[in-house]
Amino acid sequence: MADYPAVIEIPKGSRNKYEVDHETGRIRLDRLLFTSMSYPADYGYVEDSLGEDGDPLDALVLLDEPTFPGCQVLARPIGVFHMTDEAGGDDKLLCVPANDPRQAHVSELEHVNEFDRLEIQHFFETYKDLEPGKSVEGASWDGREDAERCVNEAIARASEAGLTTARWRLPNTSQH
């Protein structure tokens, strides 16, 4: 089981959709959710990754208390929710904080309460319902092995493209 640095953009319980501007590092308010829903877990992305949708790979981190936009959390992926939105494939990793002794026993998706998984699934299947031009197609949950495959592919994709989450080109080390 590997751990990965995740950057939180949106704390649990927020309706504000914050995004990190990967060129400036600033956090901006993208929009307020149109539905009367709030994020069911801290939400952000895995650093130095590139998802199928051209953005960093999304990650939810199950924490006892919400953090804040820009907070880095060392996260352990335990599952992945596969979904599609108007931009294409949009997988969501489900993670626990790697250094939290209260979560040390959580290593598989099945260790998370089924109702909590249903709540997360319901959120992502319906949170864009009232937004013009936006759509979501719910899909399915897969476990830790698939989550690790997704994150490793996303990190490789970013590396191959020469991108970090700051969108700065990586130095070309082959000439040194």
Can you name each region flagged by the protein language model?
Residues 1-176:
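Hydrophobic N-terminal alpha-helices or hydrophobic patches in metabolic proteins across all domains
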